[in-house]
Amino acid sequence: MQGKKPGGSSGGGRSGELQGDEAQRNKKKKKKVSCFSNIKIFLVSECALMLAQGTVGAYLVSVLTTLERRFNLQSADVGVIASSFEIGNLALILFVSYFGARGHRPRLIGCGGIVMALGALLSALPEFLTHQYKYEAGEIRWGAEGRDVCATNGSSSDEGPDPDLICRNRTATNMMYLLLIGAQVLLGIGATPVQPLGVSYIDDHVRRKDSSLYIGILFTMLVFGPACGFILGSFCTKIYVDAVFIDTSNLDITPDDPRWIGAWWGGFLLCGALLFFSSLLMFGFPQSLPPHSDPGMESEQAMLPEREYERPKPSNGVLRHPLEPDSSASCFQQLRVIPKVTKHLLSNPVFTCIVLAACMEIAVVAGFAAFLGKYLEQQFNLTTSSANQLLGMTAIPCACLGIFLGGLLVKKLSLSALGAIRMAMLVNLVSTACYVSFLFLGCDTGPVAGVTVRYGNNSARGSALDPYSPCNNNCECQTDSFTPVCGADGITYLSACFAGCNSTNLTGCACLTTVPPENASVVPGKCPSPGCQEAFLTFLCVMCVCSLIGAMAQTPSVIILIRTVSPELKSYALGVLFLLLRLLGFIPPPLIFGAGIDSTCLFWSTFCGEQGACVLYDNVVYRYLYVSIAIALKSFAFILYTTTWQCLRKNYKRYIKNHEGGLSTSEFFASTLTLDNLGRDPVPAHQTHRTKFIYNLEDHEWCENMESVL
C-alpha cells in the first residue's frame, strides 16, 4: 500500500498537471473567442450592409426627376442610369458566386461593400464638378409668380433666355451623365457578393430549422432599405441644391416651385458613409465559424445529435459531388466547369421552377412598385411627395413584416419542402386576389377641356378634341409642362393659359364660358372626382394586406432553393438565382409596364418640337392594363409553384412527420438512405423524435440534385 502511494501520488500529480494544462488551454481558447465568432453578430453586420444597399438603390429612384432637371437629361437617359446598376451586377455575379464559395466570404462581402461606398461617393461627385444651378434659366415661360398664364400681344416674348439655347443645352452631351452611369455600375459590381455569399454563409452556420428565420430577417432589412431611401430622398430634396455654396436666405423660390432643385447629392454621401462603415465589420469574421460559437445554441440543439454540428456536411449524402470544384485545378479549368455546373443546376426541375417562380414574383414588385407612385398620382390625384411618403410608410413596412413572418412561419411550423411550396401557393393565391380587387378601386379621368371633352363641356370624340380653342389661340400656350387647374365650371384645364386666364391670380379666364365672367376663375390642381377619397382609403388598406401576404412567399422560396442543391454549390445556386432575377425580374418588367402605361396616354407634352412625357392618361384603361399585367405575372408564378409541388410530390414514397420537426440532411442520408440500402426497409423504430421519409429516387441525378427536402 505504501509502495503504491508514491506511484499513485505521482500518477495523480501528472494527471492533475495534464488537467490543469488542458484547463488553461481551454481558458485561453475562450479568451480568444471574439464577438466575430458569433453568427448572430454576422447577421447584424449583414443586415446593416443590406439595409445600406437597399437605401442607396431607392434613393436613386427618388431623385431621378431631380437629376433630369439638374443635368438637362431626357427620360431615356435617366432610364439608362437606373439600369446601370443591374448591368454592373450581371457582369460578375456568376463568377463571384462560384469562386466566392471557396474563398473568404466575409472579406469578399466587405470588399463589395467598399466598392459600393465608392460608387455612392462618385454618384455625388457631378454636383461638385459642374457649375452652380441657375434657376432663372430653368424655365422658358412662367409668370412672375411661377404660373403659366395667358400672354397676349407678346407681353412676355422677351422674358427669360433664348428657348433655342435651352434646347441645345438639354440635348448636348453631358459628361456628368457618363459619370453617373459609371458610379451606378460600380454600385452594381460591389453589390454582387453581398446577397449570395451572405445567405450561404448564414445557412452554413445555423441549424436547418433556424435558417428560414435568419434569412427572413436578412431579406426584411433589404426590403426595409427602400423605405429609408424614399424618406431620405424626401428630406434631401427639401434642401436647396447649392445650399453649401450660397446663402439660401436670398432665394425667392420654395420647394413647391417647379424650378426648385433639391440637394440630391447629400443622400449619396450619407449612403456612402453607411456602406463603408458597415463593410468594415465584415473583415473581422473568420472564413468559417467554429462549432458551438453561440452559447445559447447548445440547449436548442439538445433534441438533435451533437455530431451533426461537429462534422462537415456531405456533398449529397451518398457520393462526392461530381461537379465540386477541385482546388488543384487551374483557373481556366475551373472556368470551364461553370457551364457544366449551370447546366447541372438548371436540369433540376425543382430548382428551375422555383427560380422562375421567384422571377415572376419579383417582376410584379419591380414593375408594379416602380410605377406605383405614378399610379397613385394619376388615379387618386395625389402629389408626388404625398405618394412617396405613403409608400414609404405603408406598403414597404408591410412587405418587410411579411418577409419576416414568412421566415418565422417556416421555422415555427417546421415546414418540409412540400409544406413550404404549399405555403407559397397559398400566399400567391391570396395576394393575386388582392390584385384583382385593384381593378375596381380607382377614379375616372374626369372632364379635361380639349382632351376628353370640348370646351364648353360638350362631349366629343376623336379628331373633334383639341386643347387649342378660339378662347386661347392668342395666348401662345405651351405644352412643355403640365400644370392643371380646376375651373369653376368643374372642368380640368391643362394649364391656366389653356383656360384663358390673363392674370397670375387665376381670374378672368376666357374659356370658362358656362359661368358668369366674375366667377371665371380657376384653382391649381385637377378637379376632384366624386367618391375618389373613399376608393383611395380602401386601396391603401388592400395594398397593405397585399404587400404583407405577398412578401411571405420570399423566404420559403429561398429555403426550397438552397435545399435542392448540394452544399458546395449553394453559393453558386444563389448566384444563378440573383442573375436570373435581374435578367427576368428586374430589367424587363419596368419596360413592359412602362410601355403598357404609355399606350393609355391621352395627351403628350412637347419640348423643343419633340414628343415628351405623357401628362394625361385614361385612368380606367390605365388601371385595367396596369393591374392585369401584375395579375398575369402572379398567375404564371402560381403555375410554376404548382409544377414545383408536383415534382416534389411524385418523388415521395412515404412521408411521416411527428411533433419535433425536421430531420437534418446528414441524419437523413446517413441513417435512412444510401445507395446500398435503397429499396430496403428504413432504419428501425429507435430513430424516434425525428422527421422521417423515404425519398423514392427515379434516378441517380435526383440524388445529386436534391440535398434534402426539408
From Swiss-Prot:
Glycans are attached at N153, N169, N381, N457, N502, N505, N519. GO terms for molecular function: oligopeptide transmembrane transporter activity; organic anion transmembrane transporter activity; prostaglandin transmembrane transporter activity. Widely expressed. The keyword Transport applies. Residues 1-25 are annotated as: Disordered. Keywords: Acetylation, Cell membrane, Disulfide bond, Glycoprotein, Ion transport, Membrane, Transmembrane, Transmembrane helix, Transport. Disulfide bonds join C471-C497, C475-C486, C477-C501. It holds the Pfam family Kazal_2. Coiled coil: none annotated. Residues 61-79, 132-174, 244-261, 367-386, 439-539, 598-630 are extracellular. Residues 465-513 form the Kazal-like domain. It is found in: Basolateral cell membrane; Apical cell membrane; Basal cell membrane. It catalyses: L-thyroxine(out) = L-thyroxine(in); prostaglandin E1(out) = prostaglandin E1(in); prostaglandin E2(out) = prostaglandin E2(in); prostaglandin F2alpha(out) = prostaglandin F2alpha(in). Induction: By androgens in kidney and lung. It is a multi-pass membrane protein. The chain crosses the membrane at residues 41-60, 80-100, 107-131, 175-203, 223-243, 262-286, 345-366, 387-410, 415-438, 540-562, 572-597, 631-648. Residues 1-15 have a biased composition (Gly residues). InterPro entries: Kazal_dom, Kazal_dom_sf, MFS_trans_sf, OATP. Disruption phenotype: In a cholestasis model, mutant mice show decreased survival rate associated with excessive accumulation of bile acids in liver. Gene3D superfamilies: MFS general substrate transporter like domains. Belongs to the organo anion transporter (TC 2.A.60) family. Putative organic anion antiporter with apparent broad substrate specificity. Recognizes various substrates including thyroid hormone L-thyroxine, prostanoids such as prostaglandin E1 and E2, bile acids such as taurocholate, glycolate and glycochenodeoxycholate and peptide hormones such as L-arginine vasopressin, likely operating in a tissue-specific manner. The transport mechanism, its electrogenicity and potential tissue-specific counterions remain to be elucidated. This is Solute carrier organic anion transporter family member 3A1. It comes from Mus musculus.
